[in-house]
Amino acid sequence: MGQKINPLGFRVGVTQQHYSYWFAQPKNYSKFLEEDEKVRTCIEKYVQKQIKNSSNYGGIARIEIEGKTDLLQIEIYTGFPDSLVEENGLGIDKLRTNIENLLKKKSQKIQITLKNVLQPYGEPRILAEHIALQLENRVAFRRTVKKAIELAKKTDIKGIKIQIAGRLNGNEIARVEWVREGRVPLQTIRAHINYCYYPAQTIYGVLGIKIWVFRDEE
């Protein structure tokens, strides 16, 4: 059988950049890695809480973290940054305070920047969150996938593949279903492929959502 490699890791240094920029001594690497993961989890939980009741749902496309000795720069790429900014910027201040309490590093300042994604539904992470929300509300998966592809086709992408695995529509036997529109050349390293895996917690169990988005070739 063919072995499936992560499309993002496969293209790092060619068309894909790292989402984390920091350096650590070998003995401290695991500690830095754990802190990086905690910061990402903290941001995702906070954002989900903030936009849970928002009509302008955009979700997070990606989080980029750059760590220095005295500064931690965090860039959050989201579909609708306005839903995260409260009056006088209190939303960002609250998030910064949460991260400071989590890391407990008084010598390191935290700088958070929100960046707007012009085409939210061209981002696999935002699409996956949208699909997961529909599946958790017991919408039929074929209808959900069809709607997601319609949203994606309104952007400038050249191809998309969506795969859902698990007890689809509550069936006793788990299975894998996938749909592809356009080209998705996974073997071409110079192809700009965005990829996301996202779990959906349904009453029948966990459904695994995988999305590949093809934008362009170098």
UniProtKB/Swiss-Prot annotation:
GO molecular function: rRNA binding; structural constituent of ribosome
Keywords: Chloroplast, Plastid, Ribonucleoprotein, Ribosomal protein, RNA-binding, rRNA-binding
Coiled-coil region: none
Pfam families, alphabetized: Ribosomal_S3_C (PF00189)
Protein's cellular compartments: Plastid, Chloroplast
A single cellular component GO annotation: chloroplast
GO biological process per UniProt: translation
Subunit: Part of the 30S ribosomal subunit.
Similarity comment: Belongs to the universal ribosomal protein uS3 family.
UniProt name for this protein: Small ribosomal subunit protein uS3c
Gene for this chain: rps3
